[in-house]
């Protein structure tokens, strides 16, 4: 009987010791928000399909606005936009932005963005996802969340600061994306 009690006490202390050692040995990865582990500036080029430019279009409206205001509320756009290292649309793309955005405010222009930057260049291979609100009608510079990735950007997190550099009516725009990754593996 006493032998059985010793076994139970020993098992209990061993379990507590193992549990404590596993929690003590886990140290979360720290990162400095002042110094990103990767930083680069890219330019996204969006050419909207207007019924006549099927060969050049990189974005298409899938759901038309419902007429609930003057700010395209309810419009859903699918994209496959080239991303370059400079503002020139004819520059060689280093990535493609693939995904969608939709307008979600009646009182001002605001788009909710969900797209993945797909890299296939000599410098970077992999993807990361940008997902957040883009209040371009309210702010000249907007911070959007980078919420994960693959390849060279495996499980990365960071911020993409968007600045609209050029617009040509509703058919073309160029956005500067200042990418700062704070968690790199």
UniProtKB/Swiss-Prot annotation:
The keyword Secreted is annotated on this UniProt entry: yes
Effect of deleting the gene: Lacks seed-specific neolignans such as 3-{4-[2-hydroxy-2-(4-hexosyloxy- 3-methoxyphenyl)-1-hydroxymethylethoxy]-3,5-di-methoxyphenyl}acryloylcholine.
Taxonomy, superkingdom: Eukaryota
Keywords: Apoplast, Disulfide bond, Glycoprotein, Secreted, Signal
GO aspect biological process, one term: lignan biosynthetic process
UniProt-listed InterPro entries: Allene_oxi_cyc_Dirigent (IPR044859), Dirigent (IPR004265)
Subcellular location: Secreted, Extracellular space, Apoplast
Known tissue expression: Seed coat specific expression.
Protein name: Dirigent protein 12
Species name: Arabidopsis thaliana (Mouse-ear cress)
């Amino acid at each position: 009987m006493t032998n059985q009690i010793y076994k139970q006490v020993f098992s209990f202390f061993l379990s507590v010791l193992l549990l404590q050692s596993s929690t003590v040995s886990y140290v979360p990865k720290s990162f400095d928000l002042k110094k990103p582990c990767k930083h680069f500036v890219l330019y996204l080029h969006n050419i909207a399909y207007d019924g006549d430019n099927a060969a050049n279009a990189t974005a298409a409206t899938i759901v038309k606005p419902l007429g609930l205001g003057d700010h395209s509320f309810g419009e859903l756009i699918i994209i496959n936009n080239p991303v370059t290292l400079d503002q020139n649309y004819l520059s060689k793309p280093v990535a493609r932005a693939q995904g969608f955005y939709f307008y979600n405010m009646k009182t001002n222009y605001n788009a909710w963005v969900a797209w993945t930057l797909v890299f296939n260049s000599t410098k970077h291979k992999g993807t990361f996802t940008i997902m957040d609100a883009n209040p371009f009608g309210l702010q000249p510079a907007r911070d959007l969340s980078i919420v994960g990735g693959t390849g060279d950007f495996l499980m990365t997190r960071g911020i993409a600061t968007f600045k609209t550099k050029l617009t040509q009516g509703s058919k073309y725009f160029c956005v500067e994306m200042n990418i700062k990754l704070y968690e790199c593996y």
